[in-house]
Amino acid sequence: MKKQRKILWRKGIHLAFSEKWNTGFGGFKKFYFHQHLCILKAKLGRPVTWNRQLRHFQGRKKALQIQKTWIKDEPLCAKTKFNVATQNVSTLSSKVKRKDAKHFISSSKTLLRLQAEKLLSSAKNSDHEYCREKNLLKAVTDFPSNSALGQANGHRPRTDPQPSDFPMKFNGESQSPGESGTIVVTLNNHKRKGFCYGCCQGPEHHRNGGPLIPKKFQLNQHRRIKLSPLMMYEKLSMIRFRYRILRSQHFRTKSKVCKLRKAQRSWVQKVTGDHQETRRENGEGGSCSPFPSPEPKDPSCRHQPYFPDMDSSAVVKGTNSHVPDCHTKGSSFLGKELSLDEAFPDQQNGSATNAWDQSSCSSPKWECTELIHDIPLPEHRSNTMFISETEREIMTLGQENQTSSVSDDRVKLSVSGADTSVSSVDGPVSQKAVQNENSYQMEEDGSLKQSILSSELLDHPYCKSPLEAPLVCSGLKLENQVGGGKNSQKASPVDDEQLSVCLSGFLDEVMKKYGSLVPLSEKEVLGRLKDVFNEDFSNRKPFINREITNYRARHQKCNFRIFYNKHMLDMDDLATLDGQNWLNDQVINMYGELIMDAVPDKVHFFNSFFHRQLVTKGYNGVKRWTKKVDLFKKSLLLIPIHLEVHWSLITVTLSNRIISFYDSQGIHFKFCVENIRKYLLTEAREKNRPEFLQGWQTAVTKCIPQQKNDSDCGVFVLQYCKCLALEQPFQFSQEDMPRVRKRIYKELCECRLMD
């Protein structure tokens, strides 16, 4: 196993020298190192057979070694003439001629000859200087033996590959002798097409001893990505991808930002991930644009603050805003991914905060000026542009220090050359930059005179975000609208003490009339206070409820009784109407008495003990109960049935001789109906009413309101009795029971039916 590993390590060393450059051109591109099998086989002199798994492990091991040997240098980008290729092809043809032709994969001598002839024919037509050709050839072939690529992580340096090991072709353009041009070097193998490698200065740079080593791109030190050289389009695993994100600088500071609740990171920064250095020296008075643009020739052409309407195509910049040039340090425009850190110098962790100067105004008010700007459309637009647009950013509102969170962030990537805009500062305000090859221009745009700070626009639903409170800035004094406490509400002229005194007097009246606060509802309390103070106290419900609770605690016991005819109710009886208590016989009987007195000629209500007495003692036990009443002259008889734990109702309609059973749980007690039928027959014989001795029918009513708990059966029975006696429909349900209980309590205390 060790021997096998040593062999693979040696193969990796040879494979690392197959191609030494990557393609960059100033952009974010991966490092492409593919396996140059033909040169490897030519060096080893024997067939090489190894499976994919061994290749994968060998590639991973060699990747770590190569990465440690990288040296920061200028990228290689050279352009030369075709004549140099003649020498390279000649050396290649001599290198290719080996005894064993089976070591090559797909190339043949014929293809090499055709390629050489093609390059020679194209080289004859060019008239270029030979000095640059020789310099380039020398720069390409003369690699120092002790270079970083010649050593693999401190191991013994090996022989550098000769020019014949690299089949290359050179493409170039004519240049003046005094001009430091660029050279493009194309390296080919026998399997793939040519690869064009990175950009650099001319061969004069490498003549001074600078090695031709690929430049390691200057990424952000916190976001430096390490890629394996032998991973061509190899997809990173999800674990490694998430690990890199968690180790990034963004997520290290995200928790601190959330705790401080200063702002949220914009969507653009979450996507791009790479921060550029903040340029504060040129943007103290306003926001800076992340897009490169030359300095304005006229210093008077400074951009003024401009607030358009909801159209986000206008341009806004600070009074002293300065547009930095992204090429001042030699970095390419596409070399770094753009973020909003450059656009707003005061931005922290992806959130922009623009502090508005309050020195000129004593109160925190908005003052907007309408400006008209014209922007000329550029004649030429670049093919690729990066557009970032954020609809709402953070802003500090003067002395109130009110901060609104970012509501909507969007990023658009356009290849058709659309306008580039960045909108910020709590509204659809934008910044535009147009890339025109190597020059960028920043112009002000818009002919809109409407102010975004007008109340009409701010009231529009598109100007509001569901994640933040609406911002009201119509020239009036800015108030605290974040907490929505007492500051945002209209001050009440009634103080707490005055309200407490009035409320205590009202509760005294309720206690005197009803003996308790059970029948009192919230609507009645608010209505009484409104009648007294002519003001709505709905916003002070917590204070009112607290006062009522304290009052109830001070008046727990009250000697209160109700007398009606022969009935008497005390506080224990009335307490059964509170909450989910079961009604007792005293409440049922007294309320039945009120119903019977409401329609005395039509309805007769039997006592709740009637059925129990009838079952236990028979007809003789209840014979004298109707001594003074002729039941057959009534139209409706109401008989409550109390079965210890449940209340039901039996009604007798004398006009059609029907005995009906009403139960709020859908139960039918046939023996109860049969007992009432026998009683009526006996009563008809005793009172000499032969017409009621026959024709009796029984019925069970099912389509009636039903209870949904185990405590409101007595309330349902009383409601059945009232509706039947007053000939009202059953328009109540379980949800109405709390209200019905309070109403029954009041009716018992006032000894009359209210409706």
Swiss-Prot record:
InterPro entries: Papain-like_cys_pep_sf (IPR038765), Peptidase_C48_C (IPR003653), SENP3_5_cons_dom (IPR045577). Its EC number is 3.4.22.-. It is found in: Nucleus, Nucleolus. It is an enzyme of class 3 (hydrolase). Disulfide bonds: none annotated. One of its GO terms (molecular function) is SUMO-specific endopeptidase activity. The keyword Cell membrane does not apply. GO terms for biological process: cell division; protein desumoylation; protein sumoylation; proteolysis. It comes from the Eukaryota. One of its GO terms (cellular component) is nucleoplasm. Residues 268-321 are annotated as: Disordered. It holds the Pfam family SENP3_5_N. Keywords: Cell cycle, Cell division, Hydrolase, Nucleus, Protease, Thiol protease, Ubl conjugation pathway. Residues 567-724 are annotated as: Protease. The active site is at H646, D663, C713. Its main location: nucleus. Residues 272-283 have a biased composition (Basic and acidic residues). Interacts with CCAR2. PANTHER family: SENTRIN-SPECIFIC PROTEASE 5, SENTRIN/SUMO-SPECIFIC PROTEASE. Belongs to the peptidase C48 family. Protease that catalyzes two essential functions in the SUMO pathway: processing of full-length SUMO3 to its mature form and deconjugation of SUMO2 and SUMO3 from targeted proteins. Has weak proteolytic activity against full-length SUMO1 or SUMO1 conjugates. Required for cell division. This is Sentrin-specific protease 5. It comes from Homo sapiens (Human). The gene is SENP5.
